[in-house]
């Protein structure tokens, strides 16, 4: 046929059997990739430390999606929450991966069958004997079936009526686990961070889809609408399908980047806005203040801060710190976290508590500045020592650790104080192992960043695809050079005045 690469899909334009075949093959490829990727991730995943080396630090991409839907156990005997299991059941991580691969193989065979047996009676119009598809009817069928699946997911899987529920956690990502969720039918259901909205919205959207599907199965479109929207043209289906996909991709890019109940931080890592707003830092200070109010010492109050909470308050876990073309997991960047050293509190020689100004997200380097409780600069690490007035040496800054591995340890040596002041710019201070993975010390993004970038990019690409194919189907006659009035234009004597359609002669 000699088609150029960008025209090859025309071979299935008027061939319903093989159109179905290539779509089944596409499903086989998607399911096969998902299953294979899951097995690869399971082969390299280390479940030993869910607090300091969780899945998102290791660059896992499909494991978080399985986990949020209720899969927590492995046939390897481990649980995602850190415990051990003796009987993981059929729906373990490996079981789900295997099911996808088996399904992929079946789809592969079905695609071959439909490619060979393409000329089926079901695709023939009994009036003309030519291949054709009743697209409005097919639309109704698909809408009905997707509505049933959507309703079933919300009413059974999420609620735990027949299924495990979904991953639910507290606002600080500390107590996450899989549990049933009751639908939220009030205004709270519209809060993107309320898990109950997932159940209620799937039930509502599924019900709407079922009703809309039945409507489109029982009511034929008006002729004017059918022709106006080119409902008989398969490219209309392509255009509207691309629209649905790019819209969904934009939505999930938003829910992933800004955070929601569907993207828990325990599975995908924290969002950049939690660093920007000092979200975890405020909670840590609140807990310490509450401890001090109960007559605990500073050391006791800081020692009760969960290591998991402290780890979230570290800039290396900010997905916006990773460069666009830095491949690899977060662990390949700053290393594998070993332990929390504790919270450093700096003081000058007059006993004032000093706070290190934290590095904003989009800075690679940032001056080390220490301010007091009123925001007044009291110390810094100067660029030019000759002109310095607030250097650590001049101000006599000391540092003492509370909580963590260095609890109770203090330093007055200026070089050591400056070292910890630089590290305090990056949030809570952790011991990081950079030797095991030969980590290069350059921050990487988390799967949250990759997912957002990928879906936003493809959404933009698919948006143009929707415009392209929509224009092709709406203006097909124009692009083909076929004008409905063309025959009248060239017919001798059709108009009293040449080229003026308002002077058309009446047929005798």
From Swiss-Prot:
GO molecular function, one term: chlorophyll binding
Cofactor-binding details, from the entry: Binds multiple chlorophylls. PSII binds additional chlorophylls, carotenoids and specific lipids.
Keyword entries, A-Z: Chlorophyll, Chloroplast, Chromophore, Membrane, Photosynthesis, Photosystem II, Plastid, Thylakoid, Transmembrane, Transmembrane helix
Pfam families: PSII
Function: One of the components of the core complex of photosystem II (PSII). It binds chlorophyll and helps catalyze the primary light-induced photochemical processes of PSII. PSII is a light-driven water:plastoquinone oxidoreductase, using light energy to abstract electrons from H(2)O, generating O(2) and a proton gradient subsequently used for ATP formation.
A GO cellular component annotation in the UniProt record: chloroplast thylakoid membrane
Residue ranges crossing the lipid bilayer per the database entry: 21-36, 101-115, 140-156, 203-218, 237-252, 457-472
The protein's assembly and partners: PSII is composed of 1 copy each of membrane proteins PsbA, PsbB, PsbC, PsbD, PsbE, PsbF, PsbH, PsbI, PsbJ, PsbK, PsbL, PsbM, PsbT, PsbX, PsbY, PsbZ, Psb30/Ycf12, at least 3 peripheral proteins of the oxygen-evolving complex and a large number of cofactors. It forms dimeric complexes.
Biological process, per Gene Ontology: photosynthetic electron transport in photosystem II
Gene3D superfamilies per the UniProt record, alphabetical: Photosystem II CP47 reaction center protein (3.10.680.10)
Record's bilayer topology term: Multi-pass membrane protein
Keyword hit for Transmembrane helix: yes
Domain of life: Eukaryota
PANTHER family linked: PHOTOSYSTEM II CP43 REACTION CENTER PROTEIN (PTHR33180), PHOTOSYSTEM II CP47 REACTION CENTER PROTEIN (PTHR33180:SF35)
Gene source species: Coffea arabica
Subcellular location: Plastid, Chloroplast thylakoid membrane
InterPro entries assigned: PS_antenna-like, PS_II_antenna-like_sf, PSII_PsbB
Family stated for the protein in its record: Belongs to the PsbB/PsbC family. PsbB subfamily.
The protein's name in its UniProt record: Photosystem II CP47 reaction center protein
Main location: plastid
């Amino acid at each position: 046929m000699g088609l150029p690469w960008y025209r090859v899909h025309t071979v299935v334009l008027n061939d319903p059997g093989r159109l179905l075949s290539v779509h089944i093959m596409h499903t086989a490829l998607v399911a096969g990739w998902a299953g294979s990727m899951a097995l690869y991730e399971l082969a390299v995943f280390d479940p030993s430390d869910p607090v300091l080396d969780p899945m998102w630090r290791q660059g896992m991409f499909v494991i978080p999606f399985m986990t949020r839907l209720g899969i927590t156990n492995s046939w390897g005997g481990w649980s995602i929450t850190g415990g051990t299991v003796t009987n993981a059941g059929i729906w373990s991580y490996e079981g789900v991966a295997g099911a996808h691969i088996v399904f992929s193989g079946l789809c592969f065979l079905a695609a071959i069958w439909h490619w060979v047996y393409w000329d089926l009676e079901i695709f023939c119009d009994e009036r003309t004997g030519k291949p054709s598809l009743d697209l409005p009817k097919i639309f109704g069928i698909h809408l009905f079936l997707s509505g049933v699946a959507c309703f079933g997911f919300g009413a059974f899987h999420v609620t735990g009526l027949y299924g495990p529920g979904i991953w639910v956690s507290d606002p600080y990502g500390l107590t996450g686990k899989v549990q049933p969720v009751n639908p939220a039918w009030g205004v709270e259901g519209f809060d993107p961070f309320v898990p109950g909205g997932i159940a209620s919205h799937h039930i509502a959207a599924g019900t709407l889809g079922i009703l809309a599907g039945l409507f489109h199965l029982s009511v034929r479109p008006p002729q004017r609408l059918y022709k106006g929207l080119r409902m008989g043209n398969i490219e209309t289906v392509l255009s509207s399908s691309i629209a649905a996909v790019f819209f969904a991709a934009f939505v999930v890019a938003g829910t992933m980047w800004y955070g929601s109940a569907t993207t828990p931080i325990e599975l995908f890592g924290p969002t950049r806005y939690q660093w920007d707003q000092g979200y975890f830092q405020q909670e840590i200070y609140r807990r310490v203040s509450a401890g001090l109010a109960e007559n605990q010492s500073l050391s006791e109050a800081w020692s009760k801060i969960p290591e998991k909470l402290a780890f979230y308050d570290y800039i290396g876990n900010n997905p916006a710190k990773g460069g666009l073309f830095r491949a690899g997991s977060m662990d390949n960047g700053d290393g594998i976290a070993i332990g929390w050293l504790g919270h450093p509190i700096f003081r000058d020689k007059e006993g004032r508590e000093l706070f290190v100004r934290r590095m904003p997200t989009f800075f690679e380097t940032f001056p080390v500045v220490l301010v007091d409780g009123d925001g007044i600069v009291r110390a810094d690490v100067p660029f030019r020592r000759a002109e310095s007035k607030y250097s650590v040496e001049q101000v006599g800054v000391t540092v003492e650790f509370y909580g963590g591995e260095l609890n109770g340890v203090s330093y007055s040596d200026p070089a050591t104080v400056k070292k910890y002041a630089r590290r305090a710019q990056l949030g809570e201070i952790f011991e990081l192992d950079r030797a095991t993975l030969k980590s290069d010390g350059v921050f990487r993004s988390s799967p949250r960043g990759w997912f957002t970038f990928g879906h936003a990019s493809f959404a933009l690409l698919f948006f143009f695809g929707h415009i392209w194919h929509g224009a092709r189907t709406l203006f097909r006659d124009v692009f083909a050079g076929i004008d409905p009035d063309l025959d009248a234009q060239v017919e001798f004597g059709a108009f009293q005045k040449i080229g003026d359609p308002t002077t058309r002669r009446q047929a005798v």
